[in-house]
Regions:
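Conserved hydrophobic/aromatic pocket- or pore-lining residues that grip, position, or stack substrates
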Residues: 1-4, 14, 177, 215, ...
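Residue-level recognition of short, solvent-exposed, well-ordered loop/turn junctions
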Residues: 39, 65, 211-214, 228
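Short beta-strand-centered aromatic/proline hotspots
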Residues: 229-235
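ASCE P-loop NTPase helicase motor core
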Residues: 1-132
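Conserved helicase motor core of P-loop NTPases
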Residues: 76-225
Length: 235
């Protein structure tokens, strides 16, 4: 959405902000935009539609004028929304709306094993795990403590030494869970200790059980006026 906004010069907003989220006297969520107060736009483009649940989709459609165009963009193979419904996938499967599927990937090279394995997984096939000369590597560890130790080694030494990557600028660690020795909370502490250890010239601020230190890499987790969910910056 940010890229589209940069190209068109039109502002990009979250659906909640677009519909002007509000609350009732009982504290229940509602939207100011609806069928009696529709959006003024003649064309509405919604990105990341796989993340939109049934209730939010209902509110969005109610706020779009009957004469307007509604374009949905998204990957139906991504995880469905946290809320109820699998809106994008079900709409495509219904064949009630025209849809176009883009199959050529431009973000990675055509010979990328990441691309190959992505297609294999979508097609229900087992990914290629034994090609050590490409850009997709699988390392088998059973214990959480061993996983955490391997991640620290990869981020601090092995990947920077092999490919010349900057541990801070070029490497991003993704975790499926928050808790546990291999979850985000514990790994963040270990990565901070390994890549940005404390020193006298670095200011620190403790917020509950998290220490923020000058030089830390941080990610925004909530949409706000000047920053978006997922934006990365430094303390």
């Amino acid at each position: 959405a940010k890229r589209l906004s940069d190209l068109t010069g039109e502002p990009a907003r979250t659906i909640h902000r677009l519909l002007e989220v509000d609350f009732t006297a009982k504290g229940e969520l509602k939207f100011k935009r609806n069928e009696t107060n529709p959006l003024p736009a003649d064309v509405v483009i919604a990105d990341e539609m796989s993340m939109v649940d049934a209730l939010l989709m209902c509110s969005l459609v109610r706020a779009i004028k009957p004469t307007s165009k509604f374009i949905m963009v998204g990957d139906s193979n991504q995880l469905p929304s946290v809320g109820a419904g699998n809106v994008l996938k079900d709409l495509i499967a219904s064949h009630y709306i025209p849809s176009v599927e883009l199959k050529e990937i431009f973000r990675q090279a055509a010979q990328s094993l990441i691309v190959t394995n992505a297609h294999r997984i979508v097609n229900g096939e087992f990914p290629v795990l034994d090609d050590r000369q490409n850009d997709f590597f699988f390392m088998n560890k059973s214990l959480e403590s061993d996983i955490a130790e391997l991640v620290i080694q990869l981020a601090k030494q092995r990947l920077p030494d092999t490919y010349g990557f900057s541990p801070i600028d070029d490497i991003q660690v993704l975790c499926p869970t928050k808790m546990g020795m291999a979850g985000t909370k514990e790994l963040n502490k270990q990565l901070q200790s390994a890549l940005n250890p404390p020193s006298q010239n670095k200011a620190e601020l403790k917020f509950f059980d998290v220490i923020f230190r000058t030089g830390d890499k941080v990610m925004q987790t909530k949409n706000m006026e000047t920053v978006s969910n997922g934006d990365i910056g430094f303390v």
